[in-house]
C-alpha cells in the first residue's frame, strides 16, 4: 500500500476513499461500490459510499471500510498491513461498536455510535481516526481498553480524547419552561430529546441546546437544509423563533437554579 486517503473530517462518515497499491489490473475482480484505475504502474482502488454525520450514522456507507474490505479480500497488502487492516475492519463492521466489543445502550441516549472519519498516511504509517458518541452506560476509559484489546498488536490506539455524556432530566423546571413555551407558541406537543452531537451547550456548566426546528418547513429552490449549503428558513418562522426565545428567557429568569 503506497497511499491511503479518505474522509475530510473526523466527525463525518466519508463517501469516498482511495488506496494506491502495487498490483496489476489483470486478475483483480470487480466489487460493489469499488472502482479500479491504473496509475503509474500501480492500481488506484476507490471506494464510493454515502456520507453522514458521526452522531447519526444510520443509513451511511463508509467508503474507507469499502476499500479496506477490498484490499483484504483481494490480498493487496503485506502481512503487517493485513494485521492493521483487520483491526480497522473491526471498526467499520458496525457503527454500534459490536466489532470492537464496545456496543452498549442506555435509556436517555440509546445505543453507542462509532465511525471512522479519516484515513491518511503519516510517516509511513496508516492512521485511522475514530469518533464515538457514547451513552451513560460506559465511559472513555472502558471504551479505550476494549478497543486496545480488540485490535491487539495489529494497531495502536493513540491521542484519545473523551468527554462523558451530559444529561439533564426532561422534567426539570428549566427544561419544562423551554418545551412548554415552544409548544404554547407553535401549537404543537413536542417532547425534549437527546442527541449524540456535542452542541454549544458543552461550553456551559448547566445548559442544553434549544431552538425550533420544523421538518415540514417549505423552502424555495435555492434554500438549503440545516448545516447545509445556503441554509435558510422562512421569515415567519424566524419571527416565531424570536417570540419563543423571548418568552422562554423571561420564564427561565423566574426559576431558582
Features from the language model and the residues they span:
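Substrate-recognition/cap regions that form aromatic- and gly/pro-loop-enriched pockets
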Residues: 121-197, 219
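Generic non-transmembrane alpha-helical segments
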Residues: 24-34, 66-77, 146-155, 173, ...
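Zn-dependent metallopeptidase/amidohydrolase metal-coordination segment
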Residues: 181, 188-255
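A short small-residue
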Residues: 46-53, 156-161, 222-229
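Short glycine/threonine-rich loop-to-helix capping motif typified by GTGT followed
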Residues: 14-17, 168-176, 206-207
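Short, conserved loop/turn and helix-capping segments at secondary-structure boundaries
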Residues: 58-61, 172, 232
